[in-house]
Amino acid sequence: MMGTYVDLRIYDEGKEEVLDLAVERIEELENKLSMNDSNSEIFEINEKAGQSAVQVSEDVFPLIKKSAEYSETNKDGFDYTIGPIVNLWRIGYDDARKPSQEEIDKALPLVNEQNVELDADEQTVFLKKNDMRLDLGAIAKGYITDEAIKVFEENDVTTGSVDLGGNIVIRGNSPSRDEGGWNVGVQNPFTERGGIVGFLNLKDQSIVTSGIYERYLEEDGKQYHHLLSPETGYPFDNEIAGVTIISDYSTDGDALSTAVFALGLEGGLNYVNKEKGIEAIFVTKDKDIYTSDGVTDNFNLSDDEFNWINE
């Protein structure tokens, strides 16, 4: 499912059927949002680029609208029209390769959120240029995670969790204690999913990590990760190995984990410390850890290979 693992947990008695409802919701949204499924709404939008507007469902339009907002406010790091660049690199697929500079130069003019026309009344999406491509890979998992947890809420689940490939949302108190949040691991960006550098105590919140560990291409002795810049067409190149975002909604955490990664350590910390309801943990390539102001007292380092710079 979604090309990644899905872990749904409910601790309320008699609510087992809600797991099935949540899985159905995840599959429903995946079918609508996939770039590669010829029956999906995103595929149709991309196929009709430069030709005609496409009317989309009430599930898809809000996500595209949110993607447009993030693309407008985080131009250097998040752009949902980055599809032509993603298709060149194909990082994470068997045919991944480093494209030529000529190919990148040809594709970059197609990456521009200003060339998407949205009609909220008709719920239509129009890509103005031929060969434009939407890619919601930096936000869709978060949106689907939020929708799955919404199924829990609608069915009166008080304690549970949704984990879609590392996009985690926690609901209610920890099942191992009467009061208090869950101890949730912060991903180690140098290992596979599940390796952690420390813990946070969370309740009714989302945690999302973007990093160089997830998908990458090795060519000519150099590693190219999957977080691609809409400005250069190459992977972001800074001191960060991983960024973990803590927020109320996974949609925001997903988008911001990429956008904040793009800003680098200093810019990312400054951005997060000014934003309400958002916290972050940064892990650098030198294995230093920096925490935003609101999460410093909540983070517990568990791996002594890392140095927590608690300023």
Segments (PLM) and residue ranges:
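Mature catalytic core of soluble alpha/beta enzymes
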Residues: 1-311
